[in-house]
Swiss-Prot record:
Function: Binds to the 23S rRNA.
A Gene Ontology BP annotation from the UniProt entry: translation
Taxonomic lineage of the native organism: Archaea, Methanobacteriati, Thermoplasmatota, Thermoplasmata, Thermoplasmatales
Complexes and interactors: Part of the 50S ribosomal subunit.
Region of interest called Disordered, as start-end residue ranges on this chain: 1-32
Record family assignment: Belongs to the universal ribosomal protein uL15 family.
Protein's gene: rpl15
Bias-annotated ranges (Basic residues): 1-13
Name the record gives this protein: Large ribosomal subunit protein uL15
Alphabetized GO MF terms: rRNA binding; structural constituent of ribosome
Organism listed in the record: Thermoplasma acidophilum (strain ATCC 25905 / DSM 1728 / JCM 9062 / NBRC 15155 / AMRC-C165)
Length: 144
């Protein structure tokens, strides 16, 4: 009489029925196969960022304003003069902050030199402080 073979639980694939899970045939694909089909629930629970965009790249080139305070203009006055951004025309001192790389004049601090400042934008506080000492602001050829 031949002894019957025992069904050994080979490997870690227990609880899958007779001979199921012993070979390669019932794994549902390897790796990320089936993420959008039969592994969808697993993916939603454990890897929710698997599908979909990861943000976007803005192709709009925005121009960043470079501000400067009145107090900083006072502090940097000599270096601006040395670098050629302060000149004198017809007895009037002209400070060209636009050429120096600044876009906006802010009103923090004090400026004591009576002059014409060339810059694109200025705050109301900066304009009032400059007009109090007799200075003026020009942007694009027109005074502000």
């Amino acid at each position: 009489m031949v002894r019957e073979r025992t069904k050994k639980l080979r490997g870690g694939h227990y609880g899958r029925g007779f001979k199921a899970g012993r070979g390669k045939g019932k794994k549902g694909g390897s790796g990320n196969a089936g993420m959008g089909k039969h592994k969808w629930i697993w993916m939603v629970k454990y890897d929710p960022l698997h599908f979909g965009g990861k943000g976007f790249t803005s192709h709009h080139i925005s121009q960043v304003e470079v501000p400067i305070n009145l107090g900083d203009v006072e502090y940097m006055y000599e270096s601006l003069k040395r670098d050629g951004f302060v000149r004198e025309e017809n007895g009037e001192i002209i400070v060209d902050l636009r050429a120096a790389g600044y876009d906006k004049l802010l009103g923090n601090g004090n400026f004591t030199v009576k002059s014409t400042i060339i810059i694109d934008k200025a705050t109301e506080k900066a304009i009032s402080k400059l007009s109090a000492i007799g200075s003026k602001i020009e942007n694009d050829g027109s005074s502000a």
